[in-house]
């Protein structure tokens, strides 16, 4: 029997504590290799959590992702639950009509999106009501009215304590 809950924040902290220098390797949407460590993933996930909280995202708010499998997506997997949000991954292969239905049905209020998938977002933008769109830009400029992920993360110190979540 564990004497503490196995929540996402706990798993993140444990990885950063016991394996801080273990390399985390992934691919960016442009297929280039990205390398970091568990300590770096933990810090950036906490920065994302702080940035989302600063935007007014709160416990139970749904944060959707429309992106490919890469390091920033991993940061969202940890950062969103860390601040008490609900991570909702969207399938980029769905039609715009189906994506709009899923976003609306789930009640997503924030969307994290790969810049290469902005054309997909454009096709459903008028069908969904999102408070914030945060772009995982890869050397491209972020459209007006949207937030650059790296700027959001860089504005935080990475000390977000996290939301105390109950396992049961």
Name what the model sees in each region:
Residues 1, 38, 42, 163-166:
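Short acidic-aromatic active-site loops that bind/stabilize oxyanions
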Residues 1-2, 33:
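Acyl-group handling in specialized metabolite and lipid biosynthesis
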Residues 3-25, 43:
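A short N-terminal helical cap/helix-turn-helix that marks the beginning
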Residues 5, 66, 111-114:
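Active-site-adjacent beta-strand anchor residues
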Residues 11-13, 54-55, 82-151, 161-163:
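Structural core segment of the AMP-binding/adenylate-forming
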Residues 14, 18, 44-51, 155, ...:
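Solvent-exposed, charged/polar functional surfaces in cytosolic regulatory/catalytic domains
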Residues 20-22, 156-168:
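Conserved pre-ATP/AMP-binding loop-to-beta segment of ANL
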Residues 24-70, 74-78, 95-100, 148-151:
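Conserved AMP-binding/adenylate-forming core of the ANL superfamily
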């Amino acid at each position: 029997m564990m004497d503490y809950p196995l929540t996402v924040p706990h798993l993140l902290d444990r990885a950063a504590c016991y394996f801080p220098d273990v390399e985390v390797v992934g691919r960016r949407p442009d297929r280039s290799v990205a390398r970091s460590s568990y300590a770096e993933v933990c810090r950036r996930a906490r920065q994302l959590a702080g940035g989302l909280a600063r935007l007014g995202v709160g416990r139970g708010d749904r944060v959707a992702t429309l992106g490919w499998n890469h390091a920033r997506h991993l940061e969202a997997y940890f950062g969103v639950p860390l601040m008490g949000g609900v991570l909702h991954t969207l399938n980029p292969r769905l039609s715009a009509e189906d994506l709009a239905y899923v976003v609306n049905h789930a009640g997503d209020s924030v969307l994290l999106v790969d810049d290469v998938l902005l054309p997909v977002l454009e096709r459903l933008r008028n069908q969904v009501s999102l408070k914030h769109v945060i772009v995982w830009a890869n050397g491209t400029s972020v459209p007006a009215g949207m937030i650059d992920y790296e700027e959001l993360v860089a504005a935080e110190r990475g000390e977000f304590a996290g939301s105390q979540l109950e396992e049961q």
